């Protein structure tokens, strides 16, 4: 009962911060990731309170958020302690969210994620692929002023730099199964885009 109340407080807090975010790292994304992470975590026998908490706060420190929205690691930690999750649990959550980003993957060679961290990372990556991943890719490009194609910062280039690589980077068997259909849909979309815009690959490379 205590953890349920804490989770609800954290949800309300995170939602108040991310409601107006427009780059695809908004409250809807976080809510989907939390649901996916809980599903994966249950299948993988993880600590579901840690999974849900880490999923809810995972984007608050992301550099892709505007400075006016993004929080520091210490601010997130202090708020979790304020909600009563305890310093040990707060430490576990911080360990996850500071190592799960695509750009942080080098850290994992030295300090692999816990099963809770793997569940959250997989959920975040699943939300970056498939139909919702395609939609988010264009939301992000639009928010940052990047084009559809034509250079290395374009939405089209992002599929090759990151999104089409994520299927093979899933940690858990559960996520690997879920990723297959999403990856194939995304690949089909990219191939159709290349048919619709002849030479798009040459213009982007």
Swiss-Prot record:
InterPro entries according to UniProt: HD/PDEase_dom, HD_domain
Short name of any one Pfam family annotated for the protein: HD
SUPFAM superfamilies the record matches: HD-domain/PDEase-like (SSF109604)
Domain HD stretches: 26-129
CDD domains, sorted: HDc (cd00077)
Highest taxon in the source lineage: Bacteria
The protein's name in its UniProt record: Uncharacterized protein YpgQ
Organism of provenance: Bacillus subtilis (strain 168)
Gene designation per UniProt: ypgQ
């Amino acid at each position: 009962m205590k953890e349920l109340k804490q989770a609800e407080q954290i949800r309300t807090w995170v939602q108040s911060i991310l409601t107006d975010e427009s780059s695809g790292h908004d409250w809807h994304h976080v809510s989907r990731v939390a649901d996916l992470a809980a599903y994966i975590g249950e299948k993988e026998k993880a600590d579901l309170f840690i999974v849900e908490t880490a999923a809810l706060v995972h984007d608050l420190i992301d550099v892709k958020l505007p400075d006016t929205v993004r929080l520091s690691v210490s601010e997130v930690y202090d708020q979790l302690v304020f909600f009563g999750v305890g310093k040990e649990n707060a430490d576990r959550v911080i360990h996850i969210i500071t190592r799960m980003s695509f750009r942080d993957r080098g850290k994992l060679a030295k300090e692999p994620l816990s099963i809770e961290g793997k569940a959250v990372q997989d959920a975040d990556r699943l939300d970056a692929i498939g139909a919702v991943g395609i939609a988010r890719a264009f939301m992000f490009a639009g928010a940052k002023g990047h084009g559809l194609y034509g250079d290395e910062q374009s939405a089209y280039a992002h599929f090759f730099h990151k999104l089409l690589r994520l299927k093979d980077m899933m940690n858990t068997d559960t996520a690997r199964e879920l990723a297959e259909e999403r990856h194939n849909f995304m690949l089909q979309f990219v191939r159709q885009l290349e048919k619709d815009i002849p030479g798009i690959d040459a213009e982007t490379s």
